[in-house]
Amino acid sequence: MRKIKQWLAAAGTVLAVAAIAQPARADELSDIIKRGELRVAVQTSGPLMSFMDKSGKRTGLAVEVAKRMADDLGVKLVLQDYEWKGLIPALLSGKADMVAADMTPTPQRAAQVLFSAPMFYADTVAVVPKDSPYKSYAELNKDGVTVGALGASTYAEVGKKMLPKATLKEFSG
């Protein structure tokens, strides 16, 4: 049967960006200022939020917000590249001061970290080639259809719930 790559782009719930942080304490902020740098964990490849432009420079919405925060603090920005699954561990281990990513604040994540106010809200969508025979979620929810989503993400969770008959393939990002 025909397989397609299906990207579930956005989770329909809040996508919080840029200020996932441990409880903000005065000593942590003073440590950042004394150190002279804000260490920010970003996705190695998270287009729109964090990616390399054609000149090889890291950019994206989350990166630009992190730059602004470092500028406001008067410190150097140090971006640290991680795969998706390494973002929260980098924060919890103290390697990073914050995470800048499009991360939905799930109960499991909120039990470990604090989230900023959301920068935007997004609906869940499916993306298929223009000439695809699939025109609805119902048509994708069939045996023999393979969909893809970012592993360990709310995209994957939405895919499992909305397309239980399809095969979900999770990708790192």
Region spans (language model):
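Bacterial N-terminal signal peptides that target proteins for export
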Residues: M1-A11
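Bacterial N-terminal signal peptides
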Residues: A10-A19
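Sec/Tat signal peptide C-region and signal peptidase I cleavage site
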Residues: I20-A26
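Extracytoplasmic small-molecule ligand-binding "clamshell" domains
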Residues: D27-D102
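Ligand-binding cleft/hinge of the Venus flytrap
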Residues: S50-K54, A66-V75, Y137, Y155-S172
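A ligand-binding cleft/hinge motif common to bilobed small-molecule-binding domains
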Residues: K85-P89, M103-A111, E157-K161
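Ligand-binding "clamshell"
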Residues: P107-P118, P164-A166
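Flexible hinge/capping segments at coil-to-helix
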Residues: P129-T146
